[in-house]
Amino acid sequence: MYKLQAKRVKAAAGQMWNSNFSKIRQSLKNAYHKCKNQYPNSTRCPTMTSHDCDQEDLNADEEMNLLVMLQDIKTTQLELLSQMTGMICALSKIQEKTDFFQKQMQVLETKMNVNENKQCATAEDIFSVKEDVDALKKKVTELGNQNSCSNVHCLEVLDGEKGKEILELLHKVTQSETLKNTLTSIDSEISSAEPEKVLSYPKSTDHLEEKTISPQIKALEKSNYQNALRSFQKAKSNIYIYPDFNTWIKLTFVHGGKWRFFLSATKLEEFIQWLLSRPTLPPEEPQVITQKYCLFTGPITNLTTICVSVFNYIYCLFGSSKEEVTRL
């Protein structure tokens, strides 16, 4: 840009100088021709007359006009010089500005190069992160495929016939262990509490032994039952009720208590272990209660199960967050 402006300034200055110079030359030529025409024989006739005096006056006036013209030329030249100096100063300022702008452009270019390098580095980092994420996804899918069998088994245990089989096994285990524990406790207490009475009749008949032992067994059964109830009320469990909207377990116990809990499928193994480790209660009259495993059908039952599960979930969150199973 500044080169174009300098060319324009030079062209304008040259045009002004040429026009003024041509005018000066033309004016000088005109003055010379006038003088030559007025004094054609001045060199030949040195004598002066009155007419010659008048011509000299005219020549003096013309010389004055020439001096005025020359002064005008000088003033125009001075103006041209001042204009040229102003143009040169403007050109120098323009050149300084262009240099400053070039420096700024160089700084911007360096910054752009740095930003491009940073962008390349970030792009490489992003690609590496994507590769790591893909590798992690593959590992997660592999682990999920490995654990899918166990998870599906835990979720499907409570559906249909498998749920019935598990409940029947629970009933059998609890009933068999209660009977064994009651018999062992009764035998141990009979042997420890009444050794003399049993040994006092070594040669009696079977009929007499049944008559003497039966009231003792009944009394011991009652006392053991009361002690077991007291110890059971003091015992605490480590199993909690967890809301689960997909699966539910219906538990029927030996002594007639019917409880329905919404347990998570992952806690089923822990729940079974807890059941096996609980203290047993000797019943007054052992009875095997068999109940059928029934599934709720119909829209009303579905609504009731959903409402109960939602209430249980809200109660667990805002009430106590964990509710212990204290009665079985």
UniProtKB/Swiss-Prot annotation:
Keyword Lyase among record annotations: no
Modification Phosphothreonine, positions: T182
Keywords: Coiled coil, Phosphoprotein
Sections of the chain in a coiled coil: 93-148
Superkingdom classification of source: Eukaryota
Protein's recorded name: Coiled-coil domain-containing protein 54
Organism: Bos taurus (Bovine)
